[in-house]
Every structure is written in structure tokens, then in C-alpha cells.
Amino acid sequence: MEPSSKPRLIIAGASGFVGKALAPLLAERFHVVGLSRSERAGGDGYAEYRECDLFSLKDAERALEGGEYAIYLVHNMMPSAKLTQGDFADLDVVCADNFARAAARAGIKQIVFLGGLCPKDGSLSKHLESRVEVERVLAGHGVPVTTLRAGLILGGDGSSFQIMSRLVQRLPIMVCPRWTNTRTQAVALGDVVQLIDYVVAREAHYSRVHDVGAPEVVTYRELMAMTARALGKRRWFILTRVLSPGLSRLWISLVTGAPRALVAPLVQSLKHEMVAGPSSLATEAGLRRTSMQDAIEMAIAGDHATVPHAFRRPRSGDRPHLVRSVQRMQLPEGWTAESAAMDYVRWLPRFLRSLLRVRRDLAEGFSFVLVPLGIT
């Protein structure tokens, strides 16, 4: 198929390890466009990149213009501005909502979202709640969403896999908290990529949710033992009840070098069983699922970065000179976001009577004026 005749597919989160693995496969059928916060040239399956900050609705609208299909791989685990107020769940909602609004405006036919497995007992950590919330927000503006829910993705550059691999490499004797007895169903990166490729542009999978996982279910301790075998390391695992989640976060960060902001929500999720529900998707796609041991060996053999992208602590000069501030509030019954905003702009100049005035412009919205200085 000639490049000009290929449908245009937009990938948000193109620089992540899943996005990098996806593009070469999808490029066989699509004109693949990656979204990036900074300007960059196409390559490795991406026909082009578009500069886009998903915290800006206007940026999102420009970036999705002309697209037919979209894949959403964004997860705001680490700060991306000079000053960030709000946690990862708040930031994720803003980006997902902007993306969904822009997709609806651009006439996108389908959004494919890579989310997280949900425990069968219904209990969710904040991290897993955020994944479900993003799934809901993406579907909130009329574009059909196909969701693949996965647990730990076994890929060389994946942050979760790198954390586990570094623990095994650096600790000959591993003192294991209770959560290491929790059952999990990880999945090979290659399987995830194949299944995403399969569901894109298939109407039968619009507005559907699929759990994906390896053929077997193991505990986290067994998963670390598999990693030790793949690395050729002899390791001893000692179960303890002493390590609290807080202590676990601290020692994992110290041993692996992973930022605590990344480790904390992941550790919170480890007490929940991450087991895939029944799904015929792999069979339908003709995919023979990769065993966890094989997936781990492939991940270790892969040419992954010395320092994973998610582990890098940005220097102050690397972050945009921006403030990202997101606060949530519970609206009283009968209120809307607009009525709350209007009440705020009426209250603020009364509270700061001699300091601040609020001007309303029908085209531009509201502006705030510091009275003593005349600064808008």
C-alpha cells in the first residue's frame, strides 16, 4: 500500500517502550504519526512526529487533525513541569479528556487504550483506579474505545520489568514482603503489540474490553525466581511480615534507582491479584501466547537502555517553564463545572475586594486584574 493511501494512525505515548515496539508493525498498514512533547524527525516505523502537549486542548486538536484511528499509551507517573500540583491520577484525567475531545472533533473512528487489569474482588489501588478512570474518560465524548487491560508487561525497557530485574540482579538474598505471594499474570510485550495491531480498525472490537495475559498465573516471588533463572543468578528468597508498603517503596527505590514517585503507586497495586479474566482475543487473532519464562528471557536479551526513560530524573533545566496545577472538588448536588466556575469568579473579587477584579470577555473567558498594579 502506498504511503499516501494508508489510513493515518495517531499514537499518543509514542516514545514509551510499547509505542516504540508498535510502530514498525503498524507501519505495514498505516501512516503512523507519533505525538511528542518536543520536535523530532520520523523513523523506526513512525512516518512523522507531531509536537503536542496533551495538557493543551488546542495542541491535541492540531495533533489529531486528519487522523482516522488513535492509540492512547499515556501515563503521567512523573512530573513534566517546573512545578506540578496534583497527583498522577489528576494529570491523567486532564490529558485523557483533552485527547478524547480532540479525537471526537477530528472524527477519529476508534481509540485503542492500553489499561490495567482489575482485581476480581473489586478492590482497586489508586493506580488501578486511575487506569479505569482514564478508560471511562476516553469513552466520554462519543469515540468508540477498545481497551486492552494488561498487568506487568515483560519488555526490556518497561519500568516495572526493569524494577524487578534490577532487584534480582543486585540482591543475592531477597527479603520478600507478603505482597510477593500475590498472584499475577504478566504478559509479553510482543503479545501486547500483536493484539493491539489486531484490534485496530476492526469494528467488531469497537467499545469492547479485553483482558490480556500469559498462559500461566504465578506469584510475584515466582516471577522474580524466573527472572533469576533467565539472568543466570542464584538467589535466595526469604518471606517476612516486617516490611510495610512504605518500607517496600523505600528499599525498592534505593536498590533499583527508580524514582519514588514511580515506585509508590506500583507497590500499592501489588497487594491486588492481577489475573486476566476469560478472553478469546488471542485465539481469534491466531496468537500463541508467550510463556512468562520465555517473555522474561526475550526482555533480558533485548537491547534496552542503560537507564530506562522512566527512571531518569529530569534536571530542572530539562522541564518546561510551566506550572501544572490540577485540583478536584466534589460538586454539590445540582451543580455543574460551569456553575462552580461562575460562583468562584463571583466570590474571588469580593474576598479580595481591594486587590483583585475579574473581567469577563465572551470570546476569551475571564481575566484577573491586580488593582494596585494594574496587571492583567
List PLM regions with ranges.
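N-terminal Rossmann NAD(P)H-binding glycine-rich loop of SDR-like oxidoreductase domains
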Residues: E2-R29
